[in-house]
Amino acid sequence: MHIIIAGIDTDVGKTFVSAILTVLLQAEYWKPIQSGSLNHSDSAIVHALSGARCHPESYRFSHALAAHQAAQIDNITMHQETITLPKTDASLIIETSGGFLSPCTHDSLQGDVFAQWPCHWVLVSKAYLGSINHTCLTLEAMRARNLSILGIILNQYPKEEEDWLLRTTGLPFLGRLNYEKSISKATVQNYANLWKETWKYRDTLLC
């Protein structure tokens, strides 16, 4: 099973979720596009937290900007056809960059590029002012593309807002993230253990 981790925005917990799922599903990891933090990339973080095999990025940029902007600064021409799924027999966790409809190449959106692959999707939403609106808009865009959505992971939401989102979106609840002062291998393993029961039924969760 290949799963794409999409977020309602940047910095909503996608890398943390990716590390947890590589442990839970004994999966490999791939981030197609890395912008900025090349010495402390998301692939390096996931590997350190989970020990998972991490496939090389298709593109690596020196500045933490939208891909098309970062590519321009680094004088790199991006080609959609070079962003291809790694060959592996293992399950694969694929992490997007930024929000679902973040720019990819100069004339494409990330969600449209990744939507071509035969993968399931998980949406990650983090609580902040405006996050419910961003969650509903992102889900609307995903459903408009007829994506196979497994469900949603909610990061630091109060219980009443969790209930509202789940009731309104109709998405299966796949896990909850709490505020963590620091994240370690033990933290990741603890979440993998907590989420085990829900993810046992992942094949029946599609919506």
From Swiss-Prot:
GO terms, molecular function: ATP binding; dethiobiotin synthase activity; magnesium ion binding
Binding site for ATP: D11, V12, G13, K14, T15, F16, D42, E95, T96, S97, G98, N155, Q156
Superkingdom classification of source: Bacteria
CDD domains given in the database record: DTBS (cd03109)
Keywords, alphabetical: ATP-binding, Biotin biosynthesis, Cytoplasm, Ligase, Magnesium, Metal-binding, Nucleotide-binding
Keyword Endoplasmic reticulum: no
Enzyme Commission no: 6.3.3.3
Main location per the UniProt record: cytoplasm
Cofactor(s) the protein needs: Mg(2+)
Active site: K31
Alphabetized Pfam families for the sequence: AAA_26
NCBIfam families in the cross-refs: bioD
Family, similarity comment: Belongs to the dethiobiotin synthetase family.
Protein known as: ATP-dependent dethiobiotin synthetase BioD
Organism: Chlamydia abortus (strain DSM 27085 / S26/3)
Gene field: bioD
